[in-house]
C-alpha cells in the first residue's frame, strides 16, 4: 500500500497499474480514477545510461490529475506533457542477481526525487 498526502489529507493508492485508483482516507469517502496516455515506444537497454535505469510501479503522463497535484506539492514545474515514473527504484547493473523488476523498467532523464517520481521516462524493452 502506498500513502500519498495532498493538502494535509492522506490518500491510499489501491493499485500500481497505469490506471490509478485512489481512495480518500477521511470521511466521507471520495474516489478518484485517473487514466493515462500510452507510454512512449520502448528503447533497448544500450540506449540508456545505466545510472538512469529505474524500476517504476507505473509511468504516467505529467498532465494526469494525480501527478499534477503531486508535482505541485514537490514544487516541480514542467514544460509540456512528459512521462513520469511513479514510485521508482534504481537498477544498477542489468543481469546481476538481485536486480529484478516486476513492474515497469524505464530509462529516466531526472531521478533526483528519492524514488517518489522520475521525470522523462521511456520504457526499456527488456525482461529483468
Curated annotation (Swiss-Prot):
Entry keyword DNA repair: no
Annotated keywords: Cell wall, Disulfide bond, Glycoprotein, Secreted, Signal
Subcellular location: Secreted; Secreted, Cell wall
Residues of this chain annotated as glycosylated in UniProt: 110
Principal subcellular localization: secreted
Pfam families: Hydrophobin
InterPro entries given in the database record: Hydrophobin, Hydrophobin_CS
UniProt xrefs under PROSITE patterns: HYDROPHOBIN
Function (record text): Aerial growth, conidiation, and dispersal of filamentous fungi in the environment rely upon a capability of their secreting small amphipathic proteins called hydrophobins (HPBs) with low sequence identity. Class I can self-assemble into an outermost layer of rodlet bundles on aerial cell surfaces, conferring cellular hydrophobicity that supports fungal growth, development and dispersal; whereas Class II form highly ordered films at water-air interfaces through intermolecular interactions but contribute nothing to the rodlet structure.
Family membership noted in the UniProt record: Belongs to the fungal hydrophobin family.
Protein name: Class I hydrophobin 19
Amino acid at each position: 500500500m502506498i500513502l500519498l498526502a495532498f493538502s494535509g489529507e492522506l490518500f491510499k493508492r489501491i493499485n500500481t497499474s497505469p490506471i490509478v485508483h485512489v481512495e480518500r482516507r477521511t470521511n466521507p469517502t471520495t474516489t478518484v480514477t485517473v487514466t493515462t496516455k500510452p507510454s512512449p515506444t520502448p528503447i533497448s537497454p544500450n540506449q540508456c545510461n545505466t545510472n538512469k535505469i529505474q524500476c517504476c510501479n507505473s509511468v504516467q503522463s505529467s498532465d494526469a490529475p494525480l501527478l499534477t497535484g503531486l508535482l505541485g506539492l514537490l514544487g516541480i514545474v514542467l514544460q509540456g506533457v512528459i512521462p513520469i515514473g511513479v514510485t521508482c527504484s534504481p537498477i544498477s547493473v542489468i543481469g546481476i542477481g538481485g536486480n529484478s523488476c516486476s513492474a515497469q523498467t524505464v530509462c529516466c532523464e531526472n531521478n533526483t526525487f528519492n524514488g517518489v517520481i522520475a521525470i522523462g521516462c521511456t520504457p526499456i524493452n527488456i525482461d529483468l
